[in-house]
Curated annotation (Swiss-Prot):
UniProt subcellular location: Mitochondrion inner membrane
Catalysed reaction equations from the record: GTP + H2O = GDP + phosphate + H(+)
Biological source species: Saccharomyces cerevisiae (strain ATCC 204508 / S288c)
Additional comment: Present with 1890 molecules/cell in log phase SD medium. This protein may be expected to contain an N-terminal transit peptide but none has been predicted.
Cross-referenced Pfam families: EFG_C, GTP_EFTU, GTP_EFTU_D2, LepA_C
Keywords carried by this UniProt record: GTP-binding, Hydrolase, Membrane, Mitochondrion, Mitochondrion inner membrane, Nucleotide-binding, Protein biosynthesis
Name of the protein in its database record: Translation factor GUF1, mitochondrial
Homology family: Belongs to the TRAFAC class translation factor GTPase superfamily. Classic translation factor GTPase family. LepA subfamily.
Domain annotation tr-type G: ranges: 44-228
Matching HAMAP family: LepA
Length: 645
């Protein structure tokens, strides 16, 4: 029989040489140390802020310097775009998903400790919903302007959004270390356009760290107010963003507005009414660091076991299940609606099942994408995808190709048209093939409504004429022209149809301005418009995947371009192929591919005239029969080439 002897406590000293024993019993984990630091910092020493900037003005670089100075990351040359987690974010130099990081900072002037939450927001208008939720979690923002470029369209749009939400703004001019910059001129732009005091403007170099610790961090502490939440109130949190983890499900980025929440608490989402248990909770430092609790004013993450990102609705309120009746839902929730739709089909039709799985996984990580299966008579099985904008669609396609190696045929982007019927009913059309065409289908239609946007463009004055002509040719309506400074920068405002914006308007704008123009826009509602469906026909059969909805004034020009372009990619057949463009049951353009001729006379003697005529007549009849019953073989490469810009 085995006997066990329990050693007295005094014998523990003989294990001192075993480091692991001491660590296990006497030291705390890094997460516990962080939580202990947080507990010692009062709410009035919290500062939640974001950085407002145009693309390439140095937002990610400044974020890196702040993380280095506050010892979140080690200072080294590899720290580039730490908060940009996605490969496509790093390559394009843009922020797509909102991110956050907690920082601990000791003010050298007073010796007080502060908890800073940097909320890195997307800057592009496609992700404006995420931007507004991120700003709602902040007390202030750094308005970052490039000293070499000055104020740009995105700077203006995001400034007004932050200003409208009541954020305290700190104007900062970046890249002051460059020799060719005119800091005084940029200061004048900020003062004149945003009416911010010149003495409040701080000059920094995000790349070298110049003035970041000396001037910017003290300004964040002095000028940005602490969170206004109440720790004694019932818990409620604002859902800022989410991303999908294969093991955890949806990970939620939240701002704790009131109260506190702990691991294992039972919570409920106000919009979906779904109930959950908190599986994990913590801060981003800069990656997920579990702390076991979050309290008023903090920005961190929650894992609730959501299996689908669609359950995580941006702007939703999360509350304690036991105190639902005592808790007021946070205002301002608005469901995000897709504004750009495309048809997507596998470049190789046999890959549909595998690609369907890849597509579903990627959609799990982006709850703003809508996904429906559809079938095309030309391209086979595919999907109808809805996006927040053209950049959103481009990023999704790039991620699908890079992360999963999937190749797609993407149809021409379309926008949602509103059809108003004579009986007062309305229908939103997102697929051009479903758009009413011809006199019979349009007889019950009272009006068609087309979405418009208000575009803000900044550009050098020398390109003003070219840009105005571009806007006018795209059915634009001028709103305002503002001259930003004596150096020739102009801000131009136009109403434009959304359909023209998604048809590579930004590329055309860059072309006519030699890359110097910038663009931002916001929704301007629907207007009654004279739009029709344009179809491409091959031997009388419409190719559904290539249909488009256009304004009546553009139909003839686009139709002629279509038939000429498609003719280039269709191989000749043994019979004549007719390519036509049709709108309102009327053929507006036509191209013909002549039949490939087979020499049936090569074995005949030259003098056998009757036999010659008989064979030619038989060939003619055969081709006529083939044309009526034959199916034209158009390969996938032809569609890809035609849809390529």
């Amino acid at each position: 029989m085995l006997k066990f002897r329990i050693r007295p406590v005094r014998h523990i000293r003989c294990y001192k040489r075993h480091a692991y024993f001491l660590r296990y019993n006497h030291t705390t984990t890094p997460a516990q140390k962080l939580q202990a630091q947080i507990e010692q910092i009062p709410l009035e020493n919290y500062r939640n802020f974001s950085i407002v900037a145009h693309v390439d003005h140095g937002k990610s670089t400044l974020s890196d310097r702040l993380l280095e100075i506050t010892h979140v990351i080690d200072p080294n040359a590899r720290n580039k775009q730490v908060l940009d987690k996605l490969e496509v974010e790093r390559e394009r130099g843009i922020t797509i998903k909102a991110q956050t990081c907690s920082m601990f900072y000791k003010d050298k002037r007073t010796g007080k400790n502060y908890l800073l939450h940097l909320i890195d927001t997307p800057g592009h208008v496609d992700f404006r919903g995420e931007v507004s939720r991120s700003y709602a979690s902040c007390g202030g923002a750094i308005l970052l302007v490039d000293a070499s470029q000055g104020i740009q369209a995105q700077t203006v749009a995001n400034f007004y959004l932050a200003f409208s939400l009541g954020l305290k703004l700190i104007p900062v001019i970046n890249k002051i270390d460059l020799n060719f910059t005119d800091v005084k001129q940029v200061k004048d732009q900020i003062v004149n356009n945003f009416e911010l005091p010149e003495e409040d403007i701080i000059g920094v170099s995000a790349k070298t760290g110049l003035n970041v610790e000396e001037l910017l961090l003290p300004a964040i502490i002095d000028r940005i107010p602490p969170p206004t939440g109440r720790p004694d109130k019932p818990f409620r949190a604002l859902l800022v963003d989410s991303w999908y983890d294969a093991y955890l499900g949806a990970v939620l980025l939240v701002n704790i507005v009131d109260g506190s929440v702990r691991k294992n608490d039972k919570v409920i989402c106000a919009q979906t009414k779904e109930k959950y248990e908190v599986k994990d909770i913590g801060i981003m430092y800069p990656d997920r660091t579990s702390t076991g609790t979050l309290k008023t004013g903090q920005v961190g993450y929650l894992v609730l076991g959501m299996k689908d990102s669609k359950e995580a609705k941006i702007g939703d309120t999360i509350m304690h299940l036991s105190k639902v009746n005592e808790t007021e839902v946070l205002p301002g929730f608005e469901e995000q609606k897709p504004m750009v739709f495309v048809g997507a089909f596998p470049a190789d039709g046999i890959e549909f099942k595998a690609m369907d799985d890849d597509m579903s996984r990627l959609v799990l990580n982006d709850r703003s994408v809508t996904l429906e299966r559809e079938t095309s008579n030309a391209l086979g099985q595919g999907w109808r995808l809805g996006f927040l904008g053209s950049l959103h669609a481009s990023v999704f396609r790039e991620r699908l190709e890079k992360e999963y190696g999937s190749k797609l045929i993407i149809t021409q982007p379309t926008v949602p048209y509103l059809v108003e019927f004579t009986d007062g009913k309305k229908k939103l059309i997102t697929n051009p093939d479903e758009f009413p065409d011809g006199a019979t289908k349009r007889v019950n239609v009272a009006a068609f409504h087309e979405p418009f946007i208000e575009a803000v463009m900044t550009l050098p004055q020398e390109y003003l004429g070219s840009v105005i002509r571009l806007c006018d040719s795209n059915r634009g309506e001028q709103i305002d022209i503002t001259y930003l400074n004596t150096n020739g920068q102009v801000m131009l405002k136009y109403y434009l149809p959304l359909s023209h914006l998604v048809d590579d308007f930004f590329g055309k704008l860059k072309s006519v301005s030699r890359g110097f123009a910038s663009l931002d826009y916001e929704d301007a509602g629907y207007r009654i418009s004279d739009v029709v469906k344009l179809q491409l026909l091959v031997n009388g059969n419409a190719i559904d995947a290539l249909s488009r909805v256009l304004h009546k004034s553009e139909v003839e020009r686009v139709g002629r371009e279509w038939v000429k372009k498609f003719k280039e990619y269709v191989k000749s057949q043994l019979y004549e192929v007719v390519i036509q463009a049709r709108a309102n049951n009327k053929i507006i353009a036509r191209e013909t591919i002549k039949a490939r001729r087979k020499d049936v006379l090569q074995k005949l003697h030259a003098s056998d005239v009757s036999r010659r005529k008989k064979l030619l007549a038989k060939q003619k009849e055969g081709k006529k029969h083939m044309k009526t019953v034959g199916n034209i073989q158009i390969n996938q490469e032809a569609y890809q080439a035609f849809l390529r810009r």
